[in-house]
Each structure stands twice: as structure tokens, then as C-alpha cells.
């Protein structure tokens, strides 16, 4: 547990976990990061260094009631299963880049990664930066990138997201982008946002299998290796069993 800390003016991540729980057995990490003030991070390495990074394929971690602010790239990154992110405040993030988000997750071609919750957070003053006189593009408060599936995003407040379309349209700037399927987005409040919600079919949808279930269109998953070797893959009903 990391709680009640003030973390600031660090060269890379404010908090980084290399391993969070057991991905194959779904044994939770029980990591809790709470009540921290994290700001002015990524002072030396400016991209993909965040206030909180739960690491790759994390299981059962919690980020609660933290204030993450004043960062050049993402405020928080997570991947995995059964993570809970609530009561946090995110602001003045992604100040030096485009195509990044305050809270970024990438389930990518892992559609059995379910049970993640993002709720009761406050996102504000994001996507308003000008880089060498050019407006940002493709910046969101929350993004489930590359076909992220099965996330629950609810009861969050989004305020002052974007520059009011002063660039080219909304510049791809807004509150939520959910690029996959089976994402539940409800009871959120959007105030003064360029755009509230966007879903894209830019990435190939999960394909139907012969037995009426679904499977991802990647070599690793078509072979059944990942699905067969994770409890979550075995128990998710809409995925093909190899």
C-alpha cells in the first residue's frame, strides 16, 4: 500500500509497479495506491512516464482518491483484469503531446480482460495545450485503446475538456473514447467538453467463431495459447475455447 504521500519533480514515473498479481490464476495483487498528491513527474523522460503505472497485465489493483496533475504525457496507465480506479482527480495532463490521454488503458487483443472499473473520478482541464502554435489532436480524458473490451466507466465528472474546437473541429479531443465492445459507460456528467463519447471501428471487430462464440483475430489468440492458459479466458463465456 502506498498512501498519503506527496510525490513530485521526479524524472520518470511517480509510482510504477512492474508486477501486479498473477495474470494466469487471477490471484489479485491487492495493491492499493490512495490519497497521494502526484505532480510534476516525467521531468527527464517525457513520454509514457506517468503519475501511476500499474504495469503490464495487472490484476486486482486499486487507485483511489489520488490527485494526479501537471504531467507532459499520460497521468495513469493500466492494463489487465479486475482493477478499480475511483475517487481520483486528473488535471493538466498531456500538456506536450497529441494522441495520448489522462487515463489510458490498452486491452488490445486481450478481450478476456474484464472486470475493470473506472468510477467517481474528476477529470478537468485536459486537451487544451498548444504545441508550437498548433492545437493538440486525439487527446482524451479516458481512452480504452486498440479494441479495449469490457470496461465499466461510470459516475465520473468531466469538465473543461478541449479547447472549444478552436483548432480543426473538435481535434479528436473529448472525454471518453472506447474503441472496443462490451464497454458499459453510464451515469457520467460532461460539462464544457469538446465531445463526450466516441467509439470507432478503426480496429477490426472481434470475429465470430463457428460455434457462435467470439475470438480475437490475432495469431497468439487464434492458437488458443493465451485464452487456454488464463482462468479469465476460460471462464469468459463469449470467447471461443480451443
Residue spans for each PLM region:
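Short glycine/acidic-rich loop motifs that flank beta-strands on beta-rich extracellular proteins
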Residues: 11-17, 26, 42-50, 72-79, ...
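Flexible, surface-exposed loop regions and adjacent strand-edge segments
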Residues: 204-206
